[in-house]
Amino acid sequence: MRTGVIAKKLGMARFFDEAGVHVPVTVLSLEGCQVVAHRTKDKDGYVALQLGAGSKKPKNTSKGLRGHFAKGQVEPKAKLVEFKVSEDNLIDVGAELTADHFVPGQKVDITGTTVGKGFAGAMKRWNFGGLRATHGVSVSHRSHGSTGQRQDPGRTFPGKKMAGHYGQETVTTLNLTVWRVDAERGLILVKGAVPGTEGTFVKIRDAVKAALPADAPKPGAFRGAGAPTPVEAAADEAAPAEEPAVTEAPAAEATEAGDQA
């Protein structure tokens, strides 16, 4: 079982495949997704990787978390998430996961927090049909109707579908398809919609109901701590090489060389 990644939802876009079919995709960005700590069987009772993503100012980070990040030699992160893995899929602390951790065509499960819509009635929140338009019904056309039974049990059961806060829940969308991967810019394009608003973090992991592709990297695609990103490496290669400085001989030495000739 491999680790997942933490990505930031940038928004949606549209592309066209080779057949000219319109493909709506969600653009997800990996922003400094690093391994912060290990969870081991001996110490914690389970095996997992703690990942961090995004950046956070040290002054806005608690003292305990500052020490936690310093122990792993990573910068303070805005988001911390644990992914359970098998022992052979552990990755060194400080390593940064890259977008080619997933391969095009792979199925993934994505977890995020849905858009909050405030207080909503039962018809909007639970798709209730409402009461009749006539035949004695007045004012209560959009109400949910009865909430209980009679004297026995004499109460409303917990979990009854009623009006209340709508949205802002943790939701996992299963079996989304990875359409394209841009490892150089750290982007993952996924077919369809992903829960959450733009700018929020989501968790991406291998689909639990689909087989892992044979070409998926194990234990994952990552670069070591301190290694340059593809953009930085390309910039270094494109930079012009420094020409060696040409030093002129002093005038006295040039005159002596002319006299000897």
Swiss-Prot record:
The keyword Calcium does not apply. InterPro entries: Ribosomal_uL3, Ribosomal_uL3_bac/org-type, Ribosomal_uL3_CS, Transl_B-barrel_sf. One of its GO terms (molecular function) is structural constituent of ribosome. Keywords: Methylation, Ribonucleoprotein, Ribosomal protein, RNA-binding, rRNA-binding. PROSITE patterns: RIBOSOMAL_L3. Belongs to the universal ribosomal protein uL3 family. Part of the 50S ribosomal subunit. Forms a cluster with proteins L14 and L19. This is Large ribosomal subunit protein uL3. It comes from Phenylobacterium zucineum (strain HLK1). The lineage of its organism: Bacteria, Pseudomonadati, Pseudomonadota, Alphaproteobacteria, Caulobacterales.
